[in-house]
């Protein structure tokens, strides 16, 4: 069936901000869908609230709306753009839920919009746990025994039938939010209450336990003529009980017999037919009892998913692109598989002759209070994928791609001769955490047999054999040393994935010595192509991975090449914003006639799409792996300043190995990062920093702190995302920090800065060229005060309260800094501004980062200036004048960026903001005034607007004066006020009628009781010092559990209260309309 001619305009809904369970894989699928549909001549309208995505670039769709993904807002867009169809399968759970809301509220019917890709009934049947179970029974497939409950009483009745342990899965939530595994009645009641509250339809599935069963996924694509193909089978190394997003997964499945594989293949196709997914990709999950072979269907997603991004990258088959074309009427046999140059139709099932391993990346170090055990609720923030000719090779490559500091299956640090530590080891094997893989390796070091490890972990013995093999090879290396290794043995070690760095660790040498030995013995990797057909057809697409075999398929050209190093796995502090910059660099330099080479190992991203750059190397970002690629490709320049801290850490070593690093020199990067050298530069330029110093011992830290004065911001040097950063208010606090939080030494000193209380923080992004010309990209004023990590603070462009004179002063300082550091490309600078009593401002320089920052995409969207593209051209030698961009663009509207946090997913974590970054994503709102833009950003971030009721106020002494106008504004809007004793006295004194309530420590009834009883609608709570923060923890946590809006800074509270009247009001603007205003 050729494409439909009755559709002209198609609306695509994106996935919104990056959250746990929904990361940049939907930017990848959405961007593919936009490109595919526009190439077919359709007009595409896109809505997505996340400015850090490639899909929201103005040239990705005909009309791009960075607006809240709520049915009311989307209705305004539908009324304005009049689409013929809505494609809801590219934006994850967010888009599906929004599409169902639009259908349920009659919006689609009212405007005559057709759902394509997945029908309303199909979405409902797949997402509604009870309907799905009944549907499976009708086609003779089993689900785990389970029933749906809409109340705690009903849940307890079902639990009595299925027994403990019990699995709880809320309906219509993302990444298993609100779910879990329970072993006793108390846990059961807790999780049921939470699940019912977090499910948008207030229902949960109470399910029998299939813990320890094997888990498999099938990625299926089906067209309107009922042609079905299996793109990929995926096996979870971790058994059932760990969310598939948190499991180590392997493709293709390794431990299925052919008969079992055919059985799952037939079952997954039957599931798609029954649910009614008639065009597009779906993912079906199965559990298999290893003892009896019983197969159950766990669930299916009637959309592209995290697994389909993985399957696409693993096979080279672009699922989202194909799914988009199937949704407009094509059939699989009419479409070509582009990776083979169109030699095969898309109806050929991909076949692969290598093994792919995905390992998730966690961020528990950011949330020490979180429960780090892995369950059915997803907790990972990113993932890494690696390819090899054997499972062992791809596993070890993935481990070093994770960037957790491990270069192989390193020991966990347990003393394996101690009885106590062996108890810990057994517990870690039984109750999985983020590091379980390393404990498995430790178990073999401790002499456990495969059967022992299986009995504790239920990881299939086939995988355990492979890990045992790696550990045995390590043992032989330790005994024999580097001197005894010949070419054959070294090649064998490389074939099972050993890195040079790991071999060096085991033989007590260094990486340089191992590399030199490899050179002498001529042991070098070759590069193989990913072609989706196991080499059956020749492919012109250069999508490559390394392995140690005979024939190399890299076939490099002799064109001028630029290599871009990506950011590796997503994590807190280094996310999609950096991938956005890498993609822009590839696109711009490709337009300029360079051959672009991307190196990255994150399967979720647009940068690892095989048609983003000319050549893609899917490899870990380590010195060894990058140098090998450089040797094959000989680029004229390598860009390290776009992938965050990951490639920056390699800059000096690359330069030392003769690699041409372009842009700002590694020497300048080091000057900006080295505190003492940078301090001298700041003094030479006559700029002002907060009083600060560097301590190399714990004693020195305490002495220097007395000179600077408290409060202090303390942190280790060289960190991204404020890792291990803290504000300390006194000597006892500092002593604890240098004792517990960091190991202070000559090589890793600790940095002390005077903390500027109540200062306004400002971010400035600029581009500089080789002639020292500087383009100001944007000046952003933070809404939260200094002391909240810049990545966690909301910010406004242009600034909403800074005077023009102060803004000009900032511009002058930034230009001088960029010139002094010889920046070529992007630079981000952070300032803090303190107001004097006479109204004048003092500007303090906080830090300079001569690299792409996480605000680049936001600034580009707000101003219409593609900063990353312009800066990439500056790095290859073009000046700003040659690119005709010399003037800063300051919009007449306001754009506000709001950070999105994972607190709901992580039980036990304090949602207070501080100097350590904890947000996973961001949204953007635009308005004609700051308050209107802030309101739109809050809507996009799903932050509830408090309706008049009782507001609870409890603030530290320095904030009492500043909270008064905020409280008066609340009273004016009809709110009542409840406060703790000190705040109550101050408000009473100033004529505010309010009630007093106990702090938690003062006895009951206290404020937490009021929150639990639903008597509080809004909370303003500021604290300082560890003790006060700990005392008020339960207030913030209960507020989060009961979905009560809260502010932990005065500036945040003021912005929120002033924006309430703008909630849900105002027209919607496309980026194209906004950018047109800027060009007038």
Curated annotation (Swiss-Prot):
PROSITE patterns reported in the protein's UniProt record? ATP_GRASP, CPSASE_1, CPSASE_2, MGS
What's a single GO CC term here? cytoplasm
User: Which residue intervals make up region (Allosteric domain)?
Assistant: 943-1080
Provide the residue positions that the database annotates as binding ATP 1. 129, 169, 175-176, 208, 210, 215, 241-243, 285, 299
Tell me the segments the record calls region Oligomerization domain: 404-554
About its domains, the entry says: The large subunit is composed of 2 ATP-grasp domains that are involved in binding the 2 ATP molecules needed for carbamoyl phosphate synthesis. The N-terminal ATP-grasp domain (referred to as the carboxyphosphate synthetic component) catalyzes the ATP-dependent phosphorylation of hydrogencarbonate to carboxyphosphate and the subsequent nucleophilic attack by ammonia to form a carbamate intermediate.
Record-stated family: Belongs to the CarB family.
Identify this protein by name: Carbamoyl phosphate synthase large chain
Organism for this UniProt entry? Xylella fastidiosa (strain 9a5c)
